[in-house]
UniProtKB/Swiss-Prot annotation:
One of its GO terms (molecular function) is tRNA (uracil(54)-C5)-methyltransferase activity, S-adenosyl methionine-dependent. It catalyses: uridine(54) in tRNA + S-adenosyl-L-methionine = 5-methyluridine(54) in tRNA + S-adenosyl-L-homocysteine + H(+); uridine(341) in tmRNA + S-adenosyl-L-methionine = 5-methyluridine(341) in tmRNA + S-adenosyl-L-homocysteine + H(+). Belongs to the class I-like SAM-binding methyltransferase superfamily. RNA M5U methyltransferase family. TrmA subfamily. GO terms for biological process: tRNA methylation. This is tRNA/tmRNA (uracil-C(5))-methyltransferase. The keyword S-adenosyl-L-methionine applies. Dual-specificity methyltransferase that catalyzes the formation of 5-methyluridine at position 54 (m5U54) in all tRNAs, and that of position 341 (m5U341) in tmRNA (transfer-mRNA). GO terms for cellular component: cytosol. The gene is trmA. Pfam families: tRNA_U5-meth_tr. S-adenosyl-L-methionine binds at Q193, Y225, H230, E246, D305.
Length: 374
């Protein structure tokens, strides 16, 4: 996809995704289908930069022909990104220190109005000295001027093994869900939900099914692959306590930031892989859990949002030990494979499709399961 949108055919392609999900998963009980906005839905955008004489353009490469295509407007991106793109390029072209050897431009925007721009170069932006590392003063001055002249909250300069951060390397997103505001730190160059409006729908659906799993808020939730705490925080008021695991050090730190920002006091995040927490629940000891008494938790629900490869064998078995399973999937093929095993012990109560990526084959979905009576 080269930034094109096709609003006139969106309803048709959305219906095709629904049909494909039904073919893969079979019956879709209590099915919710969340359509995206047909334009201006992406909060992230990355473009290569091509220099030809006096001309400098954003480009993307056609997946079939591999030819470069100049991008002059991008209706997929949030309005704030789409509006900024030509203005930013005009300033870059007029500023040699910003333009020279510029290789890529990344945009990260929020519904709450913040904008982070990363300029990536094939030249050095820093110099080693006897006292340390010095930033390219001319580049820093030009970048600061750019930030003053355009609606850019933060600017970052990157080169090979170098990073200049003028102030912050993250934005703060505020998502509105069920008459509540959830605050999330979104760090540059790390995973964030690309379709912020759809992220709100996903949180709404997860909260809805969580309330059915734990109507009196007396039981606890365990979450695997929690990232920056996106779901953990939004589900925290649906459970007595939440234990969330994540393997990325950066994501764990961001989750802690978000826990504090949202004034949540019942979520604990630990840096552990899914297979490690599975072993811990079976009695194996881990140093990272030395301050956590797993036996004190009353888990009745597990939340999983695995990578495209789906659940590994150990985790697939582990999830069946819980009364309720909330499974968010970015790959319906691996979800279908996992459900073949999980459906032996659990029944599907509710399903959902979230169109995170319009005009692509990608499908994001949700499944809520309950243990079958013995």
């Amino acid at each position: 996809m080269l930034c094109q949108t096709y609003p006139e055919t969106y309803a048709e392609q959305f219906a095709e995704k629904t049909h494909r999900l039904e073919q893969l998963l079979g019956d879709l009980p209590n099915f919710d289908a969340f359509a995206s906005e047909p334009e201006h839905y992406r909060a992230r955008a990355e473009f290569r930069v091509w220099h030809e004489g006096d001309q400098t353009d954003y480009i993307m490469f056609d997946q079939q022909s591999k030819e470069k295509v100049a991008i002059h407007h991008c209706p997929m991106a949030l309005e704030s990104i789409a509006t900024l793109m030509p203005k930013l390029m005009a300033h870059i072209v007029q500023t040699p220190v910003l333009r020279q050897k510029l290789f890529q431009v990344d945009f990260l925007a929020t519904l709450s109005g913040e904008m982070l721009v990363t300029l990536i170069y094939r030249k050095s932006l820093q110099t080693k000295t006897e006292t340390g590392v010095e930033n390219d003063v001319a580049w820093v001055d030009a970048a600061n001027a750019l930030r003053c002249e355009l609606p850019i909250t933060h600017i970052i300069g990157r080169a090979r093994k170098q990073k200049i951060c003028l102030d912050k390397d993250y934005v703060i997103e505020k998502l509105q869900v069920d008459h509540q505001t959830f605050i999330y730190q979104q760090i540059e160059n790390s995973f964030t939900q690309p379709n912020a409006e759809m992220a709100q729908n996903m949180l709404h659906w997860a909260r809805k099914v969580a309330a059915k799993a734990n109507p009196d808020q007396q039981n606890d939730l365990i979450e695997l692959y929690c990232g920056n705490g996106h779901f953990s925080i939004a589900l925290s008021d649906q459970f007595h306590r939440v234990l969330a695991t994540e393997i990325s050090k950066t994501s764990v730190a961001s989750a802690q930031f978000n826990i504090e920002a949202n004034k949540v006091d019942n979520v604990t995040v630990v840096k552990m892989a899914a297979e490690e927490i599975s072993a811990a629940l079976q009695g194996e000891t881990f140093f990272r859990l030395k301050d956590i008494d797993l036996s004190a938790y009353a888990f009745n629900t597990i939340f999983v949002d695995p990578p495209r490869s789906g659940l590994d064998d150990l985790t697939r078995q582990m999830v069946t030990e819980f009364d309720y399973i909330i499974y968010i999937s970015c790959n319906p093929e691996t979800l279908a494979h996992d459900l073949e095993a999980i459906r032996q012990t659990h029944e599907v109560l509710e399903t959902a499709l979230f169109d995170q990526f319009p005009y692509t084959h990608h499908i994001e979905s949700g499944v809520f399961l309950k243990r079958k009576p013995k």
